[in-house]
Every structure is written in structure tokens, then in C-alpha cells.
């Protein structure tokens, strides 16, 4: 499979001549890097006239002047996280503010200068702040560097492992450091932030990086780098500390503002800024149910010797991934059986199943229904989607836009009334929502619960308390929150976000089942995420059970389906930079051709196809 990349043009001063460089490069089937370089020579005056537009200001960049300096000179920094730019976006590409658009030194032989291209047909530079997901990701990477560097300064032999996010906080595990002291560590982090030193990258060879990480007992990083196709790596350095991440960071450590560090078992909690008011620290909320389920996944990963991407790759290459699949699927079945036991022991008549997009809710509902049947129950699968009100009756919000994720798009009064009637043994006619027409229809779908009937109601708002009638017997309701809480890390300092896995799942599913393009899925994703933050995540701790729908093996399987789709995205597309980031991670993963081992009722089948729950024959 040919892997092709396009690098936008870079204007440089090459030996006294303005030089516009454009390059294409790709990997052939043997992963050999082939570069085609086109160099168009112009005089130096052309370079000088290349202007940038930064928030309405036209700037002629001076040689060797960074975007950071330009933004400073424009007076766009206030010292507040809410208003200060963190990174920049140019022609769909995200850049560090330390990026230098025009350099005076001889850069022609340096491939890195081509990769870091200054590409904008009109020169527009979009400044990205904390209110953007891109800005928050850059802040997170900056926080990681500051934390790990500070830990290294205090206790050089200590090991830190990125664990999981808990609301607006991050749990980091610390090992090999019996003397670890949270307060002392917090002071050191503040000291590093106050030093406000620049965060510059340096390009080194993969061998240099592997030698460094092996010498500093960071075998997790060295093992991962052995799967990297490129011969070089961009690292961040300070003194004798060296680390790398998968994206841009803030220009200096001083951008780490509005944070806190709290003690935690075997480590600490880093509390991020408030998303709605970044100039203050968010309130840390303990989530014991979520935390316990995540730790259970980590324990299983350790037992299966699959805690990192390098572990997964080795299992794929050895063929042992088949055993991993069998154990994962057996574990899921065991959990569904246990949940069915709990539902029946309580005497619940209604199961409410919620979770964020691409969590595998539909397959989970069907597999739970199968287990309930082994108890002699008659499960009835329903969807909250059928209780949507007509689209033309949805009122816009204060911003004038219609929020289709809002709970007010559901007829909660009708749902509450019909639920009460069903539990009283009455017959009701259930509505059917016609998504093509955007209207509710009544097609004679009547329902009455038998003594052995159990409703399984799936929907993003299923855990919202507004759904249920008052004074309802709590024992009649059983709540489940489903989410793929993947326990795999790239390495100790780089975790794989649950949202990343869900985006991979959704991209493949939307293409396979709906014919939706990568561009369309990625364009909708920010809106989906905002809806989840507002309407799903706040209620997850209300669940009686949190069900982890991830599997340790699925990244190796799903790569086969998503990789070709991502490579079709062109450089000029708005989502190109996001696709590059996704490809960057997938490049480390060894593809596994083991579909014949995946059961037809697997949650993974909901996304790659072949799930027999959806057969019509």
C-alpha cells in the first residue's frame, strides 16, 4: 500500500536566493521513503513580500523571527490562559508558535525544513487558544513535559506513567520512587513553569533516541521506536532530559497556568483549567466507579502481557494475538453475564444504557439481551431516538443554533408517561421517529409488558435524571454506562485517549454502513464531543455498572479498515492535519489480519462489519 504525503511550500533564503520548495514523498510497499523535490527559484525580494495575516494585522516576517515574537509584538498576549494563543494553524496545519516562517540559514539539504512548511495561499495565521480542542491538547502536552521534567529534576530514577483522565483531571502513576512527595513535586512543577523557558524541538536519529532511552531505563519508549518507519524523531530537550510527544506544545513552560496537583494512590492527580473559564482551576470530582473499571482493565492488560503498543505488536507478530482475542471476548461475555445476574437479582424491569458515540451501545444491548434470556426473561430493545420531537419544533439556543444533542430535543414528558403506563401493565403505542422526514410517526407499534419482560432502553440521555417520572421505585431501574476505556499506552508518557479509539471506530463504521467520508465524520466530531461533555459524561457515575467495551486487540484489527481511508485525504482538505495525527499513531501499530478469529457478536464487529445481530435474513 502506498503511503503518500504532501508537504506545503516553504520560503527560504538559500545562498542568497529566495527559494520556494515543494515536495511530495511516499512510502512504497517496502516502506522505503521516496522524496520528489521541486525547487522553484525566485529572487529574494519575492520572499520579503510574503506577508502574514495575524488576526487582521498584516505582517512582513523578518528572517529568523518566530510566530511567538510576531504575536508578542502585536500585543496579543495578556498573561491570561483564556485569551493567550497557544499554537497556530496555517492552511489546515497546526504549528508551534516557535515556528520560524522565514529563515536566513541554508536549509536546502534539511528535509525537516520542508516538512515544517509555511503554507498559506493568503498568509492567514489562525491563533488557537484554550477554548479549542487543539489548544487544550497542546496545553496537555505542555503539562506532560513540565511534569515529567520536574519529576526528573527531583528524582532522576522515578518512573511516571500516564494512566487515565478523570473528568477534567489526569491520573499519573509514579513508581520506583519511594521518597515521592506530592507537595514537593507540586512546588517543582510551579518552579519549572515560572522559569518560562522555551520549548524547542531537536531532530535526532531513531538510533540516537533508542540509545538514550535504553540508557535511561525507558525501555517502553525504545521498544516503541523500533516500529517507527522514519529514521528521525523530533524530541524536546532541557538539560539532559529528553522526551517526545505526538503534537505541538505551547512556546514556553510559562503557559502552564490554572492547574493543581493532588495526591492519589501510587501517584498524583493533575487538575486542568476549567473548560468554561480557563483562568481558574476546574473542580476535581472523584469518580470511584470509573476509576475501578479502568484499573480492572489495566490489571487484565498486565495479565495478558499487553500494556503498550509494542506489546500488542509483538503479540501480532508471534500469532499470539489470536489467544488475546479469545480471552478478550470471553471476558466480555463473562461481564455481560454478570450484569444480567445483577439486573435479575434486583428485579429491575427497565435497563437504561448510555454512553458516548461509538462505545458499542447497540451490540452491548443485544448481548445483554441474550444473557437475560438465559434467565427466562423477555428483553425488549428500545431506543430513545424514537422519542425525538419533530425537527421543525426544536427551538434554537441563545446562539441562534439548534443543538440536536440537547435533552430538550426529546419528548421527556411522553417517555415518562409511557414508562409509567408500561410498568403498570398498560398497553401503549410507541412512536417511531422517521429520520429522513425529521418527524415522529405513529405506525401502530403497540407494547405491553409481560411479567418476564425487561425493557433495554438505549440512548445518549439514558442516564439523565430528567427522563424518569418522580416517585418511581428505584429497584425497577438498572443503569449502565458503556465506554471503551482502553488501557493501552503508546509508552509510559503517551497514552491512547478513549476518544481517539472512539473516533477510529466511528470513522470506519460511518464509511462501512453509511458511506460517510472521513472528512464528514471528522467535521462532525467536535459537535459530537461537545454534546458528550454536556449531556453524557456528567451522569456516568450515576450508573449501577460501568461497562468497559474496549478490547486490547482492536487497534491492530481496525487499522486495516481505517488506514486506506485516511490516506485518501488530500493536503488541501480542512481535516488534513487531524488525519496526519491519526496516521502518526497508526504507523506504530502492526496490522493484524485475524478477522476469522473475531466472533460475529463481538463489539468490534459493530464497527468493522459482520455483526450477526443486524442480519435481516
For the regions a protein language model found, what residue spans apply to each?
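Conserved nucleotide-sensing/catalytic segment adjacent to the nucleotide-binding pocket
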Residues: 394-435
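Conserved NTP phosphate-binding and transfer environment spanning the P-loop NTPase/kinase superfamily
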Residues: 468-617
